[in-house]
C-alpha cells in the first residue's frame, strides 16, 4: 500500500468518524465535544490499522454478496470497509431519510429493520445476511428497548432469511450464560433470537462476544488483571474465557472469517474463537484454495 493510499484512506476515515460523532441536536459541553473528537481520531487510527492488517492476509477465492442490517453502528461501520477491501459486494440497509455516511463502494438500500416487509424484496441476490442491529450503549435500564429493537429486528431478519432460503445467516449475539443479572434482559433477548434461528433451521453462524474493546470503549482494560487471575484459576477459568474481553479488530476478523466460510447447520463462535480469528482466517483461506 502506498503512502498516498494510506493518507487518502485515513482522510476518508477521519471524515466518516467525525460525521458519526457530530450531532447538533444533542447539546454537549466543551469537554464532551473534545472527547468525541478524540474518539473520532482514535477510531480512524484503528480503522487504518485494521485495514493494513487485512491487506496482509490472503483473500478468499469466492466473492460473497453480503446484506447488512445495523451497518452504520459501532461494529458495522468498521466491518464494511474490510469486506469491500476483500472484494465482497456489500448492500447496507438504512432507515428512510437517514444521513448515515457509508463507503461509496457499498450499495445503500432504504428500509426499516423493524419491518422485513420494507426490505425483504431487496435482500437478493445476497447470499450472506449479517444482522448487527442493536440498541446503542446497552445498559440494564434499557430492557424495554432491547425487546422493542433487538428482539423485533432479529425476529424480522430471521423470518425473512428463512423465507428466502438464505445461504448463510450471521448473527451478532452475546456471550452466555453469564452470572451478571444486571444485563439479564439483554442476554435474554439475544438468547431468544438464537432459539428462533434454530427453530427456522437457518444455516447460521452465531457470534458471541462479551465486551468489545475499541475507540470509546476502553475502560474495561482496567479489568484485564482480574481476568488473567480468573483464567489461571481452575474453578473460574471456563467462565473467564467465555466472558472474556475481545478487541474490535478481533471481532471484525471473526465476522470476516464467518462470511468467507459459510456453514451447513449452526456454528457458535465464542470468545476464544473470536480471539483466534486472526490466526484462523489465513488457514481457512489456504484450505479453500488448496
PLM region spans:
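NAD(P)-dependent short-chain dehydrogenase/reductase
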Residues: 215-238
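SDR active-site strand-loop-helix element
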Residues: 69, 93, 132-133, 169-175, ...
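N-terminal Rossmann NAD(P)H-binding glycine-rich loop of SDR-like oxidoreductase domains
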Residues: 58-86
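Non-catalytic terminal and boundary segments that flank Rossmann-like NAD(P)-dependent oxidoreductase
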Residues: 2, 6-65, 281-290
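Core catalytic loop region at the nicotinamide-binding pocket of NAD(P)H-dependent oxidoreductases
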Residues: 243, 247-249, 253-285
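Conserved beta-loop-beta element that borders a ligand/cofactor-binding pocket
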Residues: 173, 195-218
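NAD(P)H-binding glycine-rich loop region in Rossmannoid oxidoreductase-like domains
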Residues: 98-156, 160-163, 178
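Substrate-positioning beta->alpha
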Residues: 149, 153-154, 189, 219-221, ...
Amino acid at each position: 500500500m502506498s503512502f498516498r493510499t494510506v493518507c487518502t484512506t485515513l482522510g476518508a476515515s477521519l471524515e466518516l468518524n467525525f460525521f458519526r460523532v457530530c450531532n447538533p441536536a444533542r447539546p454537549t459541553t466543551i469537554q464532551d465535544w473534545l472527547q468525541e473528537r478524540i474518539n473520532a481520531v482514535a477510531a480512524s487510527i484503528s480503522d487504518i490499522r485494521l485495514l493494513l492488517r487485512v491487506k496482509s492476509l490472503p483473500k478468499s477465492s469466492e466473492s460473497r454478496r453480503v446484506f447488512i442490517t445495523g451497518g452504520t453502528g459501532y461494529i458495522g461501520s468498521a466491518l464494511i470497509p474490510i469486506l469491500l477491501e476483500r472484494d465482497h459486494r456489500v448492500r447496507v440497509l438504512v432507515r428512510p431519510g437517514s444521513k448515515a455516511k457509508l463507503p461509496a463502494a457499498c450499495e445503500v438500500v432504504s428500509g426499516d429493520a423493524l419491518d422485513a416487509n420494507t426490505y425483504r424484496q431487496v435482500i437478493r441476490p445476497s447470499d450472506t445476511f449479517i444482522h448487527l442491529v442493536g440498541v446503542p450503549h446497552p445498559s440494564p435500564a434499557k430492557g424495554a428497548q432491547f425487546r422493542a429493537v433487538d428482539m423485533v429486528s432479529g425476529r424480522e431478519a430471521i423470518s425473512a432469511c428463512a423465507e428466502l432460503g438464505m445461504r448463510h445467516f450471521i448473527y451478532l449475539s452475546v456471550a452466555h450464560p453469564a452470572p451478571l443479572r444486571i444485563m439479564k434482559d439483554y442476554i435474554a433477548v439475544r438468547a431468544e433470537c438464537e432459539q428462533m434461528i434454530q427453530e427456522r433451521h437457518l444455516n447460521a453462524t452465531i457470534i458471541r462476544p462479551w465486551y468489545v474493546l475499541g475507540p470509546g470503549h476502553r475502560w474495561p482494560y482496567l479489568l484485564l488483571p482480574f481476568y488473567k487471575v480468573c483464567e489461571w484459576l481452575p474453578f473460574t477459568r471456563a467462565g473467564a474465557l467465555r466472558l472474556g474481553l475481545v478487541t474490535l479488530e478481533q471481532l471484525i476478523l471473526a465476522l470476516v472469517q464467518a462470511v468467507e466460510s459459510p456453514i451447513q447447520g449452526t456454528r457458535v463462535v465464542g470468545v476464544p474463537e473470536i480471539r483466534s480469528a486472526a490466526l484462523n482466517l489465513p488457514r481457512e483461506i489456504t484450505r479453500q484454495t488448496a
